[in-house]
A protein has these predicted regions:
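Bacterial N-terminal signal peptides that target proteins for export
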Residues: 1-11
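N-terminal start and proteolytic maturation junction detector
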Residues: 5, 18-19, 23
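Bacterial N-terminal signal peptides
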Residues: 10-20
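Active-site-adjacent loops and short helices of periplasmic peptidoglycan-processing enzymes
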Residues: 22-159
Length: 159
């Protein structure tokens, strides 16, 4: 089989799989708790299921934590792990109480290792305390137009 025919056959098979997947969404089959599929050019909703349900954000919360840290902090600034950040449950970068890393290192721990301890240390560094940082998170979400978003902590763990 020539290279052109092989390429065309591969494209045809890919289109079949893509068409079947889109067809399943159009029929409303999903195992997700919520979903929304929109047409990019028009913004028309092609499929939605529980689209306005309030659901836990889990670790996607850390994206807002990182955004605020980058916008409001200095990457070379030292960030010290408090007793509050030490031993936070869930995924961790295993900070020791009193350990100091740069904000940049904490951000790597937050986003690459999903470090809940790093999230709390960053929140305390940027906001002064976790509750004050959460206020910043919710204010920034409102500025971005995320009017149906509510943060309760910097790491997304259930309260």
């Amino acid at each position: 089989m020539s290279g052109t025919k092989r390429w065309a056959a591969g494209l045809f098979i890919a289109l079949i799989f893509m068409y079947n997947h889109i067809g399943a969404l159009a029929q409303g089959e999903t195992s997700a708790k919520a979903a929304c599929v929109m047409e990019l050019e028009t913004g028309r909703v092609l499929f939605e299921y529980n689209a306005r349900a309030r659901l836990p954000m889990a670790s996607t919360t850390k994206v807002m934590t990182a955004l605020l840290a980058i916008e409001n902090g200095k990457l070379s600034a030292p960030v010290t792990c408090s007793s509050n950040a030490f031993g936070v449950p869930g995924t961790s970068i295993y900070l020791a109480e009193g350990e100091t890393l740069t904000l940049e290192q904490m951000l790597y721990g937050l986003m690459l290792a999903s470090g809940n301890d790093a999230a709390v240390a960053i929140a305390e560094h940027i906001g002064g305390s976790v509750p004050q940082f959460v206020q910043l998170m919710n204010a920034r979400a409102a500025q971005l137009g995320a009017s149906n978003t509510h943060f309760a902590n910097p790491n997304g763990l259930p309260n």
